[in-house]
């Protein structure tokens, strides 16, 4: 059975003709807007650090970004069951930038295992045919080759999502979703690391860490797009990843989330990491798309809800 209900696809096509907020891919990276986040960083009080690593190696960028926010050992403990939640939603190659770069996924898996994780599980609820998504994204091959090389077949596993493992879950204090079918592996994990690819989204404007958690939702996800900002707050509150590592190796600047045309892709060579998903999204939206919180309704909603930082003034962005 296809993981995404057809009504969601229809909805996205309709939204592409009507949504007023899009990221202008032709403008390239609006780096000039980013210093406003740096200047806004509070000198006192609780500050969320967001690290941006640049370089030719996606794996090295992931490691340096995570090290800059305290390192994997401040998060993963010996014996933990860790879920890595990349984007594997689309039947696209790494060059097309619709899915998370496999080198970033493997770097995170290696870090977690080195920190003593008992098991690392990698999965996503794909929109295209799941087996094609897993294979053509390069993630399946990368996981299998790493596990074989390091004799980690029992500790690093790539899973296809199974309908039977979605369970109806209450969401206390919900803004919009009092209940939803959520994936059991995510509910039972000791730690979750959210590993989206940064890209344009026809309806939401951009899709980063907050929206990537739709991959743990069952049912007809198209329904939530009518109250998307509040629903994303609810899902991230119920299953709160404590680390976001945003892959910006190659960015789909327009015609997302599925893309397919290399002309829509920009090579950027960066990885963003934070222990605060909202802060990570604020910085990534600004850095790569020139969008502030008021331009992205679900980021604005997450700030207002206190899901993480409540203002860009609480963010300290560092280049590494």
Predicted regions mapped to residue ranges:
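N-terminal and secondary-structure boundary signal
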Residues: 2-320
